Amino acid sequence: MAKAVAVLRGDSKVSGVVNFEQSSESDPTTITWEISGNDANALRGFHVHTFGDNTNGCTSAGPHFNPFTKEHGAPEDDNRHVGDLGNVTTDTSGVAKGSKQDLFVKLIGQNSILGRTVVIHAGTDDLGKGGNAESKKTGNAGARPACGVIGLSE
């Protein structure tokens, strides 16, 4: 059993916590989150980025984690970056709270997300269906108001 956490902070009012849990390398990873400070009633892009480097804010986290060199997609797509977690949905207070299971995201094994960065974006992820090159790369999710490095937890 492996558990990890990322505490999201940034240059904005957006903050939160994302937890990850995986029983074995072949099992899905359970991802839970509570993120506040977003716009009310919005979808906000939610991704694992390649680097655990936040020295220049969330920009230093690099591109989406993509060890298999796929195009950007939705979490349910086979053709997607490992780091493509889709969107979180905010309530009337701008809080996003939820959970999901993901077979591509791993805490255990060669393509672990440990030491990488979770980013919450300022815009909605179009899930690679935006009809332009940037959509196939980033989902046109926009700026990075908050992020956190994924570290082991108890």
Swiss-Prot record:
Primary location class: cytoplasm
Q: Which SUPFAM superfamilies match?
A: Cu,Zn superoxide dismutase-like
Cofactor dependency: Cu cation; Zn(2+)
Q: Which CDD domains match?
A: Cu-Zn_Superoxide_Dismutase
Residues the entry annotates as binding Zn(2+): H64, H72, H81, D84
- Keyword hit for Cytoplasm: yes
Mention one GO molecular function: superoxide dismutase activity
Binding residue positions for substrate:
R144
User: Its GO biological process terms?
Assistant: cell redox homeostasis; copper ion transport; fungal-type cell wall organization; intracellular copper ion homeostasis; intracellular zinc ion homeostasis; negative regulation of cellular respiration; positive regulation of transcription by RNA polymerase II; protein stabilization
> Which segment of the chain is annotated as a signal peptide?
none
Q: Which superkingdom?
A: Eukaryota
Q: What class of enzyme is it?
A: oxidoreductase
In this chain, Cu cation is annotated as bound at H47, H49, H64, H121
* E.C. number: 1.15.1.1
Instruction: Reply yes or no: does the keyword Metal-binding apply.
Output: yes
What are the record's GO terms for cellular component?
A: cytosol; mitochondrial intermembrane space; nucleus; superoxide dismutase complex
Ordered alphabetically, the record's keywords are: Antioxidant, Copper, Cytoplasm, Disulfide bond, Metal-binding, Oxidoreductase, Zinc
Q: Which InterPro entries match?
A: SOD-like_Cu/Zn_dom_sf, SOD_Cu/Zn_/chaperone, SOD_Cu/Zn_BS, SOD_Cu_Zn_dom
Q: What does this protein do?
A: Destroys radicals which are normally produced within the cells and which are toxic to biological systems.
The record's note on quaternary structure and interaction partners says:
Homodimer.
**Protein name in the entry:** Superoxide dismutase [Cu-Zn] 1
Upper classification of the organism:
Eukaryota, Fungi, Dikarya, Ascomycota, Saccharomycotina
